[in-house]
């Protein structure tokens, strides 16, 4: 029996159940992947969690239908979330994984921060450098996002080397 808290949003409960299913159903595959990798000794627990999360996202938002929805809906995060009955963050995270050769989505990056700029989640397939051991750049618009909740804030960020990213 798998129980989740009644107070959790339905999309969070669904993801938790799919994550747990991944830990059970794909345990041998995960063990093999981790054993064949050259991860540091303290990484297997994190790797299990990451692989189970990927499993959950792939189960709830299968690659091809999700990529088609992204293209058809022009990457409208809220519409895609309604279609797959998932949260805004879950859509954004899944979008960062759409890099299958010959069937790639737009290379995106995802950063989750707190109001102080501490980064708690980072994924970058766009090429943008996201700090691993420090806060976000004070010029990023992530700080303003906390002052305008419920709105999507956009920004063009230029790196010291001249690269430009849509954030």
PLM segments and residue spans:
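Conserved binding/catalytic microenvironments
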Residues: 1-167
